[in-house]
């Protein structure tokens, strides 16, 4: 990645300069508005800390959830501002709007080392607009917040890896208006993904889970030609099992993808590995009674909610000799203790391979959440990404708009 980085910016000097940082602070909240996994907040700290300590006037923009282009109190960044302040060890102001009168007044009142978090950027419909001119108008308003008193432009730091695959105002368009730099997180993430795609030590094992084949089809197609083993679990495995002619009971099934899965199994028979046993239940609930059955013997009326111990053993054998591992997507409903063993077992196998020298990447999203929820050591993996969708699109071979614009 031939872009300027945060280190370059710090070397130039940021004392007294306005710096707009696009962070990824899209954290999960419970019904009471409490953050249940602060991973992304923690990951954003190094860049923000470095800028604040260097005397920049730091303005942070980020989103939370999917508001419909207007303010939604349930998706306010207020709890994030509090958590961010705690992690930074300094007060973080929260603007009452995105680029309105409160944001402007607070931006003008910043002193060196201050941090201001703008309200949820997706409260403004222009952020995600397909209309270039609408996005650009929001980008100009964001750029104006970091303009110097003498009219000199501020700078933009892209540090939200989880959104770099989106062509949005705060990710792409604002970078066309301001001097731009990759933050610590974005630079590290891209370096890891480049290592995965360019200098892969073999055997290379890919572990894919999650619910829908359609969401992972492009990455399956791409990685099946590169990996030595492609392990498939999670809800998506049932469409593959159906493609083998097995009954999957009331398990999650994408019938429209069965023929595609059959073709993939034919083309990559030596690469794709499916579960040999499944943990089933008669309902999707934490208190459901679990039963392990052979993968080709799922009873009618039962749904698969995890891979079984035989599958964990089989996948562990494949992973034990791997030199490179990419994992995206849980093996089962890890949020329910009765259906978490598959995800935990596979994760422990990856940790074991890492301990023997393998390079392992956890591809963000639910996988990263599972690592934390199941109490697994985060340093047991070489890298835990903050961007599931961005990681997958990169590995599909797609251009990421938020990275592409930094290279210009």
Swiss-Prot record:
Q: Is Transferase one of the keywords UniProt gives this record?
A: yes
Reactions that this protein is recorded to catalyse: (2R)-3-phosphoglycerate + ATP = (2R)-3-phospho-glyceroyl phosphate + ADP
Q: Which GO terms describe its molecular function?
A: ADP binding; ATP binding; phosphoglycerate kinase activity
- EC primary class: transferase
Q: Where in the cell is it found?
A: Cytoplasm
Which SUPFAM superfamilies does the record associate with it? Answer: Phosphoglycerate kinase
A single Gene Ontology CC term = cytosol
What InterPro entries does the annotation carry? Phosphoglycerate_kinase, Phosphoglycerate_kinase_CS, Phosphoglycerate_kinase_N, Phosphoglycerate_kinase_sf
Please state the pathway this protein functions in, per its UniProt record. Answer: Carbohydrate degradation; glycolysis; pyruvate from D-glyceraldehyde 3-phosphate: step 2/5
Q: Which family does it belong to?
A: Belongs to the phosphoglycerate kinase family.
Report quaternary structure and partners. Answer: Monomer.
Q: What is this protein called?
A: Phosphoglycerate kinase
**Which species does this protein come from?**
Mycolicibacterium smegmatis (strain ATCC 700084 / mc(2)155) (Mycobacterium smegmatis)
Q: Which gene encodes it?
A: pgk
